[in-house]
């Protein structure tokens, strides 16, 4: 694997981590605090 390809892949991974981790944490806390009755 070339160094540029390795840098590209690592930037993709870090971009996904930076986007996905805070979003999932935020959704988790929102679902914990949002106690709406969703039964139909």
UniProtKB/Swiss-Prot annotation:
Coiled-coil boundaries: none
GO cellular component: a single term: photosystem II
Keywords, comma-separated and alphabetical: Membrane, Photosynthesis, Photosystem II, Thylakoid, Transmembrane, Transmembrane helix
Pfam family membership, one: PsbX
Segments passing through the bilayer: 8-28
Statement: the UniProt record of this protein carries the keyword Cell membrane: no
Single GO biological process annotation from the record: photosynthesis
InterPro entries (alphabetical): PSII_PsbX, PSII_PsbX_type_1_subfam
Membrane topology, record value: Single-pass membrane protein
Subcellular location, record wording: Cellular thylakoid membrane
Superkingdom of origin organism: Bacteria
Keyword Transmembrane helix assigned: yes
UniProt record similarity statement: Belongs to the PsbX family. Type 1 subfamily.
Cited HAMAP family: PSII_PsbX_1
Quaternary structure (record): PSII is composed of 1 copy each of membrane proteins PsbA, PsbB, PsbC, PsbD, PsbE, PsbF, PsbH, PsbI, PsbJ, PsbK, PsbL, PsbM, PsbT, PsbX, PsbY, PsbZ, Psb30/Ycf12, peripheral proteins PsbO, CyanoQ (PsbQ), PsbU, PsbV and a large number of cofactors. It forms dimeric complexes.
The protein's name: Photosystem II reaction center protein X
Gene designation per UniProt: psbX
């Amino acid at each position: 694997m070339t160094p540029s390809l390795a840098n590209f892949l690592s930037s993709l991974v870090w971009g996904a981590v930076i986007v996905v981790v805070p979003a999932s944490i935020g959704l988790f806390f929102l679902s914990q605090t949002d106690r709406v009755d969703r039964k139909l």
